[in-house]
Swiss-Prot record:
Swiss-Prot/TrEMBL keywords: DNA-binding, Sporulation
Miscellaneous comment as given in the Swiss-Prot or TrEMBL entry: SASP are degraded in the first minutes of spore germination and provide amino acids for both new protein synthesis and metabolism.
Protein name per the record: Small, acid-soluble spore protein C1
GO MF assignments: double-stranded DNA binding
Superkingdom per UniProt: Bacteria
Length: 69
């Protein structure tokens, strides 16, 4: 595993990725009927985050030829 001395492990490495992730977040929230914000339950917000992760993994698998590692 790479040695990362950065204190922020969520640092985006691709320019423009933040906007794409935000767009994905709001699209998924809309699909799930979740209004993102401070008044939303952690469970609802977490379901959106979990779905983002699931879709990003699917995209990566497609780009890598669908192989499992």
């Amino acid at each position: 595993m790479a040695n990362n001395n950065s204190s922020n492990n969520n640092e985006l490495l691709v320019y423009g990725a933040e906007q794409a992730i935000d767009q994905m977040k709001y699209e998924i929230a809309s699909e799930f009927g979740v209004n993102l914000g401070a008044d939303t339950t952690a469970r609802a917000n977490g379901s959106v985050g979990g779905e983002i992760t699931k879709r990003l993994v699917q995209l990566a698998e497609q780009q890598l030829g669908g192989g499992r590692f």
